[in-house]
C-alpha cells in the first residue's frame, strides 16, 4: 500500500494530512491553530467561550498567518432549567472561606450556538464548522451549510453517529472514552456504557457512509495508523498538542501530563470530562452529586479558581487530558503534526 488507506477526509476538507487539531477551550487558541495548520492539519478554534467580537479577532489573526482550511467549533448543549446550586455552593463553602472570595461573583457560562454566532459564521465563512453535544436547531444548521461550511459532528456511540448522519453532517468524530475534555454524549446513554475508541471506530465506520474521525487515546503515529486500519479517515488530536509550546496551559498542568493519571470528573463544569487530578478532585473525589448540571457548576467555582490561581494553585480549574498523555512529544505544533503523520504513514506503508 502507498499513501493513506482512506483519502475521503483529505479530499473533502483539503488538508495535507488527515489530522484535526482538537478545539480545546483555554488550551488551544490562535498560536496552536496556526502551528497545526502550518503542519498541514485542520486547525481549530474553540468558540464556546468567545464573544462574537473575540471570534472575529481570532479568526482574522489565524487568516493573516496561515493558509488552509479552518474549523470553528461550537457547543450545542441544552441549558438546564431550575437547577439548584445550594448544595454545590455549600460543598464549596470551605474554599470560599479559605480564599476569601464571594460565592456570588460567578464566572461566565458556556453558551450554546445561537443566531448571533450563526451570523458571525455567515460573515466569516470558515471551511469547516464542528459541533459538540449534538447539532444546532435545523434552521441554524441549514444557515451554516448555506455559508459554505462543511459540518462535523461528534458521536460517542453508533446510535449518535446514525443520528448525525441522518441530519446531513459531512464527517463524524468517533469520540472514545479515552479522550480528554468533555465527553460529547447527547442521546442519554449511561456513562457506564461508554465505548473505547478501538471498539467504536469499526462499528461506526460500518454504520455511516461519511468519513469517520477517530478521537481519544491517539497519541503517536502508532495510534494514528491503528485508527486508520480500523476504518477511520482521519484522527483528531488534542492531548498530543498539549506538550507543544504554543499551548497556553499552566506549568502545573503541563507537568502532570507525563504522570498518566486521568479521571472523569464533573466538578469543573457539571459535565463529565477527563483530566488530570488537581486539589479539588483529590479532596472531594472526582464525581459529586451536588454539582449542578453542565455548564452551571463552573460559575460557582470560578471565584475560587481565580483566587487560587493568583496564589499559584492550579488545582481548582480544569486540566483536561486524555489517557495517552504520557506519549506526548514537546515539539512545536507544525513539526509535531508533520512527524506524527510521517510516523503513521511509515507504519501503514510497512516502513515503520
What do the PLM-derived regions correspond to, one by one?
Residues 1-207, 340:
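Active-site entrance/lid segments in N-terminal catalytic domains of soluble metabolic enzymes
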Amino acid at each position: 500500500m502507498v499513501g493513506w488507506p482512506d483519502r475521503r477526509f483529505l479530499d473533502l476538507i483539503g488538508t495535507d494530512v488527515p489530522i484535526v487539531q482538537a478545539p480545546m477551550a483555554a488550551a488551544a487558541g490562535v498560536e496552536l491553530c496556526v502551528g497545526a495548520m502550518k503542519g498541514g492539519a485542520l486547525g481549530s478554534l474553540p468558540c464556546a467561550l468567545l464573544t462574537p467580537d473575540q471570534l472575529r479577532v481570532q479568526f482574522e489573526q489565524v487568516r493573516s498567518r496561515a493558509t488552509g482550511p479552518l474549523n470553528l467549533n461550537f457547543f450545542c448543549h441544552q441549558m438546564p432549567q431550575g437547577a439548584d446550586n445550594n448544595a454545590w455552593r455549600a460543598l464549596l463553602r470551605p474554599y470560599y472561606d479559605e480564599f476569601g472570595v464571594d460565592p456570588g461573583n460567578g464566572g461566565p457560562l458556556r453558551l450554546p450556538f445561537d443566531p448571533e454566532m450563526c451570523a458571525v459564521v455567515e460573515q466569516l465563512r470558515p471551511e469547516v464548522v464542528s459541533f459538540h453535544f449534538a447539532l444546532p436547531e435545523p434552521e441554524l444548521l441549514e444557515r451554516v451549510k448555506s455559508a459554505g461550511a462543511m459540518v462535523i459532528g461528534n458521536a460517542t456511540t453508533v446510535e449518535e453517529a446514525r443520528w448525525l448522519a441522518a441530519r446531513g453532517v459531512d464527517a463524524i468524530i468517533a469520540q472514545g472514552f479515552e479522550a480528554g475534555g468533555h465527553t460529547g454524549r447527547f442521546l442519554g446513554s449511561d456513562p457506564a456504557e461508554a465505548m473505547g475508541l478501538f471498539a467504536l471506530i469499526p462499528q461506526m465506520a460500518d454504520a455511516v457512509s461519511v468519513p469517520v474521525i477517530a478521537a481519544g487515546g491517539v497519541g503517536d503515529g502508532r495510534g494514528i495508523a491503528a485508527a486508520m486500519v480500523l476504518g477511520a479517515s482521519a484522527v483528531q488530536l488534542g492531548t498530543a498538542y498539549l506538550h507543544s509550546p504554543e499551548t497556553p496551559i499552566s506549568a502545573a498542568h503541563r507537568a502532570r501530563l507525563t504522570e498518566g493519571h486521568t479521571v472523569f470528573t464533573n466538578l469543573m463544569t457539571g459535565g463529565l470530562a477527563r483530566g488530570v487530578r488537581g486539589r479539588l478532585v483529590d479532596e472531594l473525589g472526582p464525581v459529586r452529586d451536588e454539582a449542578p448540571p453542565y455548564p452551571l457548576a463552573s460559575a460557582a467555582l470560578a471565584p475560587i479558581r481565580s483566587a487560587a490561581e493568583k496564589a499559584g494553585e492550579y488545582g481548582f480549574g480544569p486540566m483536561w487530558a486524555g489517557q495517552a498523555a504520557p506519549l506526548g512529544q514537546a515539539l512545536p505544533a507544525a513539526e509535531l503534526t508533520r512527524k506524527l503523520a510521517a510516523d503513521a504513514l511509515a507504519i501503514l506503508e510497512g516502513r515503520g
